[in-house]
Every structure is written in structure tokens, then in C-alpha cells.
Design a protein with these regions (language model features):
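Contiguous surface segments at macromolecular interaction interfaces
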Residues: 149-166, 224-265
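Residue-level recognition of well-ordered secondary-structure positions
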Residues: 30, 50, 116, 152-154, ...
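Compositionally biased, charged N-terminal/linker segments
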Residues: 146-194, 265
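Structured alpha/beta reader/binder surfaces that contact nucleic acids or chromatin modification marks
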Residues: 58, 171-243
């Protein structure tokens, strides 16, 4: 988990990266954004994550600059849309607030130094006169901003194991789709059984990425394969109605987001 900022300029930082690191930066930026925005995602104690707390639009702008440079070199990309979902507003106003550490000479120097440590044959020539033994500079955030579960009315989201099936029921087995019965899966089961209220809104993530099938959840029932709740179909929800849409990148099978205004009744 590391974003490289050898210069106090997103585009210039992307341009100076070699092919391997530039490609990986797209994925690492996406992972960092998810750790900042998606509850229970993990990694929130990592200093490279913490330094961006409170500045998701700025990190989104950095990620888009990296993608732009990657594509300009002739490569295919699948991350642009996912990164943009964290702060769609940056397209209309790219001059987003920047972290207070952005522009501090010592921080950018430390990133140049660590790039040399990773690939001296590439970066020694690009950053002449740079010390080659500096540790990373990871400033602490002015305020800790850890993604939390919604506090008010929720839209429950279910990631269907069969995206092409029109499910009338939601079934959560004792173990996760990966076969684990760990703490994270246990929290999903408890939410499904105890937190959900009869009649709560639900949306199903299925084959159509841009639209979610919506409905209302019925009472929890015991099933031979786990816990089950019937769904009363209601309609269709545009992905863009969830704010931010990136919350739907949550890898969990069952989770909640703030109830979109269009569903408030």
C-alpha cells in the first residue's frame, strides 16, 4: 500500500514512474480508496492509508492522473471507472482540497529516495543528487476518519452468487462464499438476522452493473442451508443514486449503505 508522489504534482508524478510501478499504482490507489471509504474493508491502520484520511477527492484525482498516463502509453485499463466512483465530482472541479503535507519538500524527497531503492537502475538517473537511504514519510492525519457503517436508515445490498438469476429470496449460509466462517462473515450474518428490520429496502447487485434490482425484505427464516429472508420486488435503482457509488465496490456479500433519497418514502 503506497502511492508514489516524487513531485508535488499528480500528473508529473505519474509521468516519471516506470511501467511496472505505474501499472501497480492504479490498483494500489483503488485499494487505498476502498480502505478509506468502505466500512470493514481493512488496512485502516496502515500509515500509507492514514495519510490520505479526509482527502478522498484528492486521492481520486491522483488515481485518475495515473490512469491517464497509463492509457497514454498505449495500455488498456479497467480501473478508471472504479476510481472515479469515489469522487465523481472531480471531473467538474479538479481543483480539490489537498492534504496539508502535499508540497512538503521532505515528503516528496522521501518518495524519490524510495523509488531509487526499489529500482536504482531506473530512478538514479531520473533523480540525481537524491539520498538513497531515506525512509518513507507518512504524515499522520489531522483528524482520524475511519469509514463507519450507516447510522440512519439503510439500503441493504446483497451481492448475488448467481448474477443472472432473478432471486425471490436471499439466503446467507453459515460460511462465506470462500468457505470461511471468520469474524467478518459473522458480522454479516448478525446484521442479516438482527439489524435488518422487516420491510427494509434491499438492492441486488447482479449482472447489470449500472442498475440494481430493488425490493423489501421479509422476516428472517431458518433454512436448512442457513438464514433466509424473502424479497418483495419493487423496482430498479441506478448505481449513481448511491453516494458515493464506490460503496457498491464493497466485497462483502451483504452490507448496508445510506438509504438513497430516491427510495425514501
Amino acid at each position: 500500500m503506497q502511492n508514489f508522489l516524487p513531485y508535488p504534482d499528480f500528473a508529473a508524478s505519474a509521468r516519471v514512474l516506470d511501467q511496472a510501478r505505474l501499472g501497480k499504482q492504479r490498483v494500489e490507489t483503488l485499494q487505498t480508496l476502498r480502505a478509506l471509504v468502505i466500512p470493514d474493508y481493512g488496512w485502516v491502520r496502515h500509515p500509507a492509508i492514514r495519510m490520505w484520511m479526509g482527502y478522498v477527492p484528492a486521492l481520486t484525482a491522483y488515481g485518475l492522473a495515473v490512469v491517464s498516463e497509463w492509457v497514454s502509453r498505449g495500455h488498456a485499463d479497467s480501473t478508471y471507472r472504479q476510481i472515479l466512483e469515489f469522487a465523481p465530482e472531480v471531473l467538474d472541479d479538479p481543483h480539490v482540497p489537498l492534504p496539508p503535507w502535499f508540497g512538503e519538500p521532505g515528503l516528496h524527497l522521501s518518495h524519490r529516495s524510495n523509488l531509487i531503492q526499489k529500482a536504482p537502475e531506473v530512478y538514479r538517473e531520473r533523480f540525481p543528487g537524491t539520498p538513497e537511504d531515506l525512509p518513507y514519510s507518512w504524515p499522520e492525519p489531522a483528524e482520524e476518519c475511519v469509514a463507519a457503517e450507516p447510522a440512519g436508515r439503510r439500503l441493504w445490498v446483497w451481492r448475488s452468487p448467481d448474477p443472472f438469476e432473478e432471486a425471490a429470496d436471499i439466503l446467507l449460509p453459515p460460511t462465506s462464499p470462500g468457505g470461511s466462517a471468520g469474524p467478518k462473515w459473522g458480522r454479516q450474518l448478525r446484521a442479516f438476522e438482527e439489524t435488518v428490520q422487516d420491510g427494509d429496502a434491499v438492492a441486488v447487485l447482479a449482472a447489470d452493473r449500472d442498475h440494481l434490482r430493488t425490493g423489501h425484505l421479509g422476516p428472517v427464516l431458518m433454512h436448512e442451508d442457513g438464514l433466509l429472508r424473502p424479497v418483495r420486488p419493487h423496482g430498479v435503482l441506478s448505481r449513481s443514486e448511491v453516494h458515493p457509488p464506490a460503496l457498491l465496490q464493497d466485497p462483502r456479500t451483504f452490507f448496508g449503505v445510506d438509504l438513497p433519497p430516491v427510495l425514501v418514502r
